[in-house]
């Protein structure tokens, strides 16, 4: 069992139940999935760029990403409908907890000039989204083999109903929030 899943079941869930004052165990907020998305606009001109992005995301997530295609043609961006424009991967269960562990304990501390995560990154329903500017903060990516620094979006979906519940959940997982 993943270290953070064990911590959630044994420590975080009972603490949140008491803190939030919920009667039913199923009402305790929990993380349902983590989605990693890498938009690669340069993939239009060069297919090799997308292959490198897919390889990087596969190393970071530990599973094969799916290639996302453009939904609409946009002349300003020189994009046609159906062209590959990025890749994404959805993590659930064990892999999700293992990624979360690496994110909180290894990757976030390696971010340059890091001053904490803004609490404004919640969507109003307890889900949390953050952007990472460089994929090299993850230990799986070797700096010498990176062709270009790419960022990625990390979206953490929870069963929390409000931002406060979501923040309490992620704070219990030792997310470094500001203030």
Curated annotation (Swiss-Prot):
GO terms for biological process: translation. Pfam families: Ribosomal_L5, Ribosomal_L5_C. The keyword Membrane does not apply. Transmembrane segments: none annotated. Keywords: Ribonucleoprotein, Ribosomal protein, RNA-binding, rRNA-binding, tRNA-binding. One of its GO terms (molecular function) is structural constituent of ribosome. InterPro entries: Ribosomal_uL5 (IPR002132), Ribosomal_uL5_bac-type (IPR020930), Ribosomal_uL5_C (IPR031309), Ribosomal_uL5_CS (IPR020929), Ribosomal_uL5_dom_sf (IPR022803), Ribosomal_uL5_N (IPR031310). Gene3D superfamilies: 3.30.1440.10. GO terms for cellular component: ribonucleoprotein complex; ribosome. The keyword Transcription does not apply. This is one of the proteins that bind and probably mediate the attachment of the 5S RNA into the large ribosomal subunit, where it forms part of the central protuberance. In the 70S ribosome it contacts protein S13 of the 30S subunit (bridge B1b), connecting the 2 subunits; this bridge is implicated in subunit movement. Contacts the P site tRNA; the 5S rRNA and some of its associated proteins might help stabilize positioning of ribosome-bound tRNAs. Part of the 50S ribosomal subunit; part of the 5S rRNA/L5/L18/L25 subcomplex. Contacts the 5S rRNA and the P site tRNA. Forms a bridge to the 30S subunit in the 70S ribosome. Belongs to the universal ribosomal protein uL5 family. This is Large ribosomal subunit protein uL5. It comes from Teredinibacter turnerae (strain ATCC 39867 / T7901). The gene is rplE.
């Amino acid at each position: 069992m993943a270290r953070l899943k064990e911590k959630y079941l044994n420590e975080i869930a009972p603490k949140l139940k008491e803190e939030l004052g919920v009667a039913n165990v199923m009402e305790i907020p929990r993380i349902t999935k983590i989605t990693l998305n890498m938009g690669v606009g340069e993939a239009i001109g060069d297919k090799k760029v997308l292959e490198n992005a897919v390889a990087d995301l596969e190393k970071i997530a530990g599973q094969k990403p799916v290639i996302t295609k453009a939904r609409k043609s946009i002349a300003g961006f020189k994009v046609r409908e159906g062209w590959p424009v990025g890749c994404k991967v959805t993590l659930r269960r064990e892999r999700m907890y293992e990624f979360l562990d690496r994110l909180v304990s290894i990757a976030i501390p390696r971010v340059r000039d890091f001053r904490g995560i803004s609490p404004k990154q919640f969507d109003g329903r307890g889900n949390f989204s953050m952007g990472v500017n460089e994929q090299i903060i993850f230990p799986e990516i070797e700096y010498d083999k990176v062709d270009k620094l790419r960022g990625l979006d990390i979206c953490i979906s929870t069963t929390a109903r409000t931002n406060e519940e979501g923040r309490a959940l992620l704070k219990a997982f030792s997310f470094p929030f500001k203030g």
